[in-house]
Structures are given as structure tokens and as C-alpha cells.
């Protein structure tokens, strides 16, 4: 290679290096920031998961400790002292209502109603509270109100639909409509999302009422 060619190559290489340095000075911080965000984001996610796990374990320990009290009133008081947010609050309300059922049924039913109407709770907890209130309240809750609550819970796609249909059938029995109750329960047995326990319970009731479950 001639000296002029060598000279031009050296100049070209220097220009490339200068240009690269300029790019790094101008845009290098973006690459560094991207790396930091990736690394930092991963670290943040891991920390958040660990923190969530620790909080869940602490919550579980607090609940178990509260339920170890011998007296139902002490258990309710201990549960009330647990700091909660979101779904945890719903769980505490349901547990407290269950404990109250042993000593103060009216207070338990009122607690379940409050939980079912608390829009700050996840929908699943509100629906469960409503169903438990219907079951626990029985005839103390007007028939039309129970029917209305169960109709909403028994809509297609609702997670508690099978149990709501079972309770709807029991309401029909309470009103002296065994044929309608059998029809509801046989339809329930044909559905795929019915648990084995519920299926056995409903089957026994249908048979006791003289219904036919041979094809179910």
C-alpha cells in the first residue's frame, strides 16, 4: 500500500473513532440508562415478590395466632387487630363473621351483609359473603331478598353459580315447590363445574324427593 493510501486510511480510522466518541458522548447515557433500568427492574421485581411473600406469611401467621384463642369473642377481637388491605380485609371479615356465628348470629349476618356491600373488597369476597348471608340468615331474611341475591349469584359464568343454584332449589322446597326444586337440581347435575361433594349432596336430595338421577 502506498503512503497516500496509508495516510487516507489512518485519517478515515481517526474520523470513525472521533465519530464514535461523539456518539458515545451524546447518546451513551441512553444505553447506560437502559442497562440500569433492566438490571434495576429485575431487582425491583425480585424485591417486590420477596416483600409480597413476606407480607403474606406475616398475615397468615397473624390469622393463625388470632384463631388460636379459646374464646370466640377473643378470636374476633384478635382478628380485628390485624392490619389488612384488599383481599386480606375480605378474608378477615368472613372469618370474623364465622366466629360471630357461634355467639351472636345477628351480628354475624350483619357483618356478612357489610362485607357483601363493601365495594373496596374484591368481587369474589363480596359474592361469597352474600351467599353465606343467605345460608346463615335463612328465614330471617325476606324470601324475595334471598331470591334476588341468589338470582344474581346464579347467573352463567359466576364462580358461585353451582352453590347458588343449590340454594335456589332449597328455596323452592321451602315454598312447597318440590317439582321445581328437582328440575333445578337435575339441571345442576348436568353441569361440568359441579364439585364431587356438591354433586353427591344434590343427588341424595333429588333421590329423597323421588327424582330420577340415573342419566346424570
Task: Say what each PLM segment does.
Residues 56-59, 74-79, 108-109, 146, ...:
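Solenoid-repeat scaffolds in large eukaryotic assemblies
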Residues 1-36, 54-55:
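N-terminal positive-inside, membrane-proximal cytosolic segments immediately preceding the first
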Residues 5, 14, 18-21, 60, ...:
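Alpha-helical membrane and juxtamembrane elements of multi-pass inner-membrane transport
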Residues 91-111, 115-216:
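Soluble extracytoplasmic domains of inner/organellar membrane proteins
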Residues 58-94:
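Short extracytoplasmic
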Residues 15, 39-61:
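Transmembrane signal-anchor/signal-peptide helices with a preference for the extracytoplasmic
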Residues 13-17, 72, 213:
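Onset of an N-terminal alpha helix
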Residues 31-32, 45, 137:
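Short Lys/Arg-rich amphipathic alpha-helical segments
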Amino acid at each position: 500500500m502506498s503512503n497516500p493510501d496509508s495516510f487516507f486510511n489512518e485519517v478515515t480510522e481517526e474520523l470513525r473513532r472521533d465519530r464514535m466518541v461523539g456518539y458515545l458522548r451524546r447518546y451513551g447515557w441512553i444505553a447506560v440508562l437502559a442497562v440500569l433500568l433492566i438490571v434495576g427492574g429485575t431487582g425491583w421485581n425480585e424485591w417486590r415478590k420477596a416483600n409480597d411473600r413476606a407480607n403474606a406469611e406475616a398475615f397468615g401467621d397473624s390469622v393463625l395466632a388470632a384463631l388460636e384463642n379459646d374464646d370466640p369473642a377473643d378470636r374476633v377481637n384478635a382478628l380485628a387487630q390485624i392490619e389488612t388491605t384488599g383481599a386480606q380485609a375480605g378474608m378477615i371479615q368472613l372469618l370474623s363473621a364465622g366466629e360471630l356465628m357461634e355467639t351472636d348470629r345477628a351480628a354475624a349476618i350483619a357483618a356478612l351483609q357489610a362485607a357483601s356491600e363493601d365495594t373496596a373488597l374484591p368481587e369474589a369476597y363480596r359474592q361469597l359473603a352474600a351467599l353465606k348471608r343467605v345460608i346463615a340468615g335463612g328465614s330471617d331474611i325476606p324470601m324475595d331478598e334471598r331470591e334476588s341475591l341468589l338470582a344474581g349469584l346464579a347467573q352463567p359464568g359466576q364462580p358461585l353459580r353451582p352453590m347458588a343454584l343449590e340454594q335456589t332449589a332449597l328455596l323452592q322446597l321451602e315454598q312447597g315447590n318440590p317439582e321445581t326444586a328437582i328440575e333445578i337440581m337435575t339441571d345442576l347435575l348436568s353441569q361440568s363445574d359441579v364439585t364431587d361433594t356438591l354433586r353427591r349432596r344434590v343427588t341424595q336430595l333429588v333421590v329423597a324427593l323421588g327424582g330420577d338421577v340415573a342419566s346424570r
